[in-house]
Amino acid sequence: MQYAPRMPRVLGVVFLLLAACFLPACAIAARPADNIDSAAQVEIAQAVRNVYPALVRIYVVINEPDDGRMRKLSGAGSGVIISKDGYVVTNHHVAGNAGRIVCNLADQEEIEAQLVGTDALADIAVLKLDLASRKKGITPVPVAQWGDSNAVRVGDVVFAMGSPAAVSQSVTRGIVSNTQLIIPRNMEGSFRLDGENVGSIVRWLAHDAIIFGGNSGGPLVNVAGQIVGINEIGLGSLGGAIPSNLARSVAERIIADGHVKRSWTGVEVQPRLKDAVAESGVLVAGVVQDSPAQAAGIKSGDLITSFDGSAVDCSIDEQLPLFNQLVLGTPIGKKVEVKLIRDGKPVAVSLTTIAREPALPRPEEVKSWGMTARNLTRMMALERMRSDKDGVLVDSIRPGGPCGNSKPGINAGDVIRKIDGKCVKDLAALRELSAEATKGKTDPVSVLVDFDRGTGGLMTVVKVGKEEPADKPALARKPWPAAATQVLTRDLAESLGMKGKTGVRVTEVYTGMAAAKAGLEVGDIILAVDGIKVEASQPSDADVYDTMIRKYDVGAEAVLTVIRGKEQKKITMTLDAPPTPSDRLAKYEDQDFECTVRDLSVMDRIQKKEDQSLRGVLVERTEPGGWAAFGGLSGGDVLISIDSVATPDVAQVEKILKAAKQSKPRRIVFFVKRGIHTMYVEIEPDWRYVNH
């Protein structure tokens, strides 16, 4: 079966608050669409011929931390094939956090893909199409060619290609209005992806080829039919593309290494002050503690004029990304010379770069704690005034989960330092210590937790593990009416010609139960039980008749005085024990598939008007954002089989799902009955998040 994506959200970055930032340095009006001459038609034809076949519409399932869980969300974006091996370039914000990726080519062929690597700082991700899954004899995938973004000029005609709003591929035409589009420093925090300031290294190509949400990741193409940018941002008719030279460099490094390695020095810079005497150089705004720059003696107020032999200059914000690219692109561990101006005098220092850490490590779900959490980086530790990066940063908490129920409760933003007196270095250590504490235990285990909140240190006790429901006391076996009724109110009695009468009216008789066997019918008015009046005349008396029946023993006979039509008659009913309540039936909650099922009750079958021979289990609930819900399973469904194996009870469901966690199939097919309909529900788990 083919992957059938759920209703996608369209992935696109739209700067609603940054409209003023996109004022082009030089604007030229686009040629009206209804006045395209023959030369323009040739340009369009060439661009479309060279790139359009290589367009890719991308559907993704991404995992995002929320309420102590990694929730699944669907999304859609665009991309372009850049090699015969099936490599696809798109944006990080489209596919960088994807657990499942499916691509539709321009000819509507559908191919699954894997994430090769991603770079949030440049907002570039690379996918690889699963070409081995294609049918034999099919033609090679079309490939688009890179162009030189440095050759792009204001006024150049360009074409934005992609899949706006997740619809089929499209092309729009416009011109370049700015080749150095940036976000001003006072608004740089407005565009961060996974903590990374994208604008620190990117100068966008601004253009007015119309783009919408869903165009993200699609190519910006010149008249020669070459990729000169990867579309990323949009506001109204103004779009911004990552220059192809930067995108290509990042993509090639991802293909080679799976990620982008960058150097870090710890120097933070800004353009020279307006009253600066110096005519060149980059102003050092600050130096990070314990960084290579600090070790080299670089100070705030220094002007860097040369870095590793390259002259540098920055008098305006537009020049900052070039300096950052130079520093970040230096080989890790290289000793470089930095020339400075300090107090008007030249100074030369040397420093050795170190590897740059990501701004934010990826979050992970720790189900036994009811939280999502992530490791700390050097910068995260410094910003939190911590002496080292040991510990685990709590990202979100599941309400009612182990962390949420602790006193004092652990909150998002807290840093877990110790478990039972043992240091927690990172998430791996937390998992290991948790496993040690719960080994061989079936009930939750209380652990002593040291954690930091701000600059204060707190302690709490967390019950780690799954909380089992408390045993419920046995129910007394008392009979039930085996029928649904309504109170014979005064108004209803008068309307039915029974003024002054009290009792209940039968609204439903449960098939196969005592009332049905006795011959009770819908519409009967029950006035008395064994000669005792049913004193029910207002809505608050709804339980009067039921209470009268429960006073008898199971198996006893009760004579009902009934009015049917205009005739009064006696009906003898042998009283039965009520069916087992739903909360007393076998139940199974799967924390990985995030759904709860239970055995079907007699009342389930009655209320759903199902034949008593129906074999299956009831899906009691699915967790929003879980794999079951994302695949389309819903609370109220009757689960009949899994992968063609019948599921007559919850024990069988548990057995099948536990076996699936060992074999890890690509897909699991649930056959369900929903109302009068039956359907197949495909669930495609991301096994990386199972048993965590």
Regions found by a protein language model. Name each.
Residues 1-15:
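Bacterial N-terminal signal peptides that target proteins for export
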Residues 301, 413, 523, 636:
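Conserved catalytic motifs of ABC-family nucleotide-binding domains
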Residues 145, 297, 409, 417-423, ...:
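Exposed loop and linker-edge segments at protein-protein interfaces
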Residues 681-692:
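Short, low-complexity, Pro/Ser/Thr/Gly-rich segments in the mature regions of secreted, periplasmic
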Residues 374-402, 595-630, 635-639:
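C-terminal accessory/binding modules appended to enzymatic or scaffolding proteins
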Residues 28-296, 300, 306-335, 341-346, ...:
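Serine-dependent protease modules
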